[in-house]
Regions:
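Membrane-interface alpha-helices at helix entry/exit sites of multi-pass transporters
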Residues: 75-78, 95-99, 110-121, 279-289
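Short intracellular "coupling" helices and adjacent cytoplasmic loop segments at the cytosolic face
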Residues: 83-98, 103-106, 195
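Transmembrane alpha-helix interface/packing and boundary motifs in multi-pass membrane proteins
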Residues: 84-93, 245-266
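Membrane-embedded alpha-helical segments of transport systems
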Residues: 87-92, 114-138, 252, 289-300
Length: 326
């Protein structure tokens, strides 16, 4: 891991712990412990497996993009690089995952300007897919339609704008006239060439379908959490409702641009569950369980992947120069 990111990751971990503590106080700590006792922990490994399936499908999207851009790499190293970036899951909008580009550069000299657009394309298709997962539930649940529609329109419009080659090349030509940017124009052209190839209709549709499937696995994990608790609450939550609540909460957490959506996602999950009349302690327990099984599990997977990558490649990632911004 990188020294300059260690403090950020540690800060996010502390912030996450404090948020869990605050929610524990909100739910009444003793009642929260009772809720955890009600949960059948034999289902927890299954929820982790579903989260990992999310990672596998997202990796397939990464591989699909990598092949479109003709970036040569063995599947094994590509998988380790992909998972290593999960340590950056607690950076705003997950954009710290551009770490993948720096590792690719170390492996085969691929310019960051060529591969970094993959991260942008990943985020675009993630947003579009989550909107797709949420949209039906929003109208059934009668909540959040406006936010979801706005986010959907914004990201679809952004994708269409990126695919408007003439306009984008004209914009880049304007950058050439700005003195301190003119020296980077070649990189801008390289980056645009990559992102343009990734957002064409066929790659966009394929990547979005992969994203829908991958994020549905985590929605399914949340559904299992709620149904394990149903014996204690006597409230059956449909898969459609669970998908909406998890997807919507993930969406606004990402929009907030806070590290890992910390605080915002948890508040949304808990609040929406309480709208369903699920007791406060069960709502908070469900939120903590799914966040540990998704966000924090991803960070742990990323840490192990970084360790394995360093040992296999004999590279010290501390020595890789990366920008200070996540």
């Amino acid at each position: 891991m990188f020294s300059k990111y260690k403090k950020k990751i540690l800060f996010s971990a502390v912030a996450g712990a404090l948020i869990f503590l605050a929610f524990s106080v909100y739910a009444d700590f003793d009642k929260l412990l009772d809720a955890f006792k009600e949960f059948n922990w034999l289902f927890f490994p299954l929820i982790l497996v579903l989260s990992f399936l999310n990672y596998i499908f997202r990796f397939s999207k990464w591989e699909y993009y990598r092949r479109i851009l003709d970036i040569k790499l063995t599947t094994g190293k590509s998988f380790l690089i992909f998972l290593s970036a999960f340590v950056m899951s607690v950076t705003p909008g997950k954009m710290g995952e551009v770490l993948k580009s720096y590792l690719l550069k170390e492996e085969n000299g691929t310019p960051v300007s060529k591969s970094a657009p993959i991260v942008v394309a990943e985020r675009l298709t993630d947003f579009i897919s989550i909107v797709f997962l949420c949209i039906v539930g929003a109208f059934v649940f009668d909540y959040g339609q406006t936010i979801i529609m706005i986010v959907g329109v914004v990201f679809i419009s952004l994708t269409l704008l990126i695919s408007w080659k003439k306009a984008c090349l004209y914009f880049i030509s304007l950058l050439e006239k700005i003195k301190f940017l003119s020296k980077h124009v070649e990189k801008f052209h390289t980056a645009y060439d990559s992102i343009y190839r990734l957002v064409r209709i066929k790659p966009l549709l394929i990547a979005t379908v992969i994203s829908v499937v991958s994020w549905f696995f985590e929605c399914l994990g949340f559904y299992i959490v709620l149904n394990v608790f149903s014996s204690a609450t006597n409230i059956e939550v449909s898969l459609l409702t669970a998908t909406f609540i998890y997807g919507f909460s993930t969406l606004i957490g990402a929009i907030a641009m806070l590290p890992g959506g910390l605080g915002v996602t948890e508040a949304s999950l808990t609040g929406l569950l309480q709208i369903l009349k699920i007791p406060k302690n069960i709502s908070v327990a469900s939120t903590i369980i799914i966040r540990v099984a998704t966000l924090w599990f991803a960070v742990v997977v990323g840490i192990f992947a970084v360790i394995i990558y360093q040992r296999l490649t004999h590279r010290d990632l501390e020595e890789i120069q990366v920008p200070n911004q996540a």
